[in-house]
């Protein structure tokens, strides 16, 4: 799950050896696509969802956005793999924070680390993991770099599904209203 054009389908293809259409524009993936891969004798089913910016419905939401939102909100996933574009982290983390608030087992995947580096953007996955309260794995899906580490992280999470500690802190008045 992630924003449009963050490399979800490229990662899906790399993990499943599929050949789903990849494009640099929104709306390429318009339905959920199911695939499988094996890691250490474990069959893992993954779902490639259309890109969304938010879990909030809006009148401008397209059908593909509803497909992704409904899949997550209907609690169909055992583990969320949230793919984010490392070169545009701030925009991508809006969806990440919404997923963290849902208190679901999650891994954040920093994709396109090569593009981030080309723009002199440095991200420490360990520090980001500590801040978010869930595993963060850095990859370059287009070059299949980091996929072994990601598979190991998925396998470990599936062995011991952990809810991320909620690191999101609101202003005091908002926290009081939430209580």
Regions found by a protein language model. Give the residues of each.
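Structured core elements
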Residues: 10, 45-46, 107, 137-140
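Conserved C-terminal guanine-recognition region of P-loop GTPase G domains, centered on the G4
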Residues: 35-41, 63, 67-137
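Extracytoplasmic
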Residues: 169-179
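Alpha-helical scaffold segments in soluble metabolic enzymes
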Residues: 10, 14, 67-70, 149, ...
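Conserved G1/Walker A P-loop phosphate-binding module
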Residues: 1-57, 73-75, 79, 101
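Canonical P-loop GTPase G-domain recognition
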Residues: 114-169
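Conserved nucleotide-binding/hydrolysis micro-motifs of P-loop NTPases
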Residues: 27, 51-54, 86-90, 112-117, ...
């Amino acid at each position: 799950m992630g924003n449009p054009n963050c490399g979800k389908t490229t990662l899906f293809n790399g993990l499943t050896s599929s050949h789903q259409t990849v494009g640099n524009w929104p709306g390429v993936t318009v339905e959920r696509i199911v695939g499988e891969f094996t890691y250490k004798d474990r069959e893992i089913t993954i779902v490639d969802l259309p890109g969304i910016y938010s879990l909030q419905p809006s009148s401008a939401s397209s059908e593909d956005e509803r497909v992704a939102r409904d899949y997550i909100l209907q609690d169909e996933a055992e583990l969320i793999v949230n793919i984010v574009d490392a070169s545009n982290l701030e925009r991508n983390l809006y969806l990440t924070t919404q997923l963290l608030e849902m208190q679901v087992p999650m891994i954040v995947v920093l994709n396109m680390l090569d593009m981030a580096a080309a723009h002199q953007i440095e991200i420490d996955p360990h520090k980001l993991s500590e801040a978010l309260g869930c595993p963060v794995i850095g990859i370059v899906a287009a070059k299949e770099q980091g996929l072994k580490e990601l598979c190991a992280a998925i396998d470990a999470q599936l062995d011991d599904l952990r809810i991320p500690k909620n690191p999101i802190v609101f202003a005091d008045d908002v926290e009081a209203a939430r209580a």
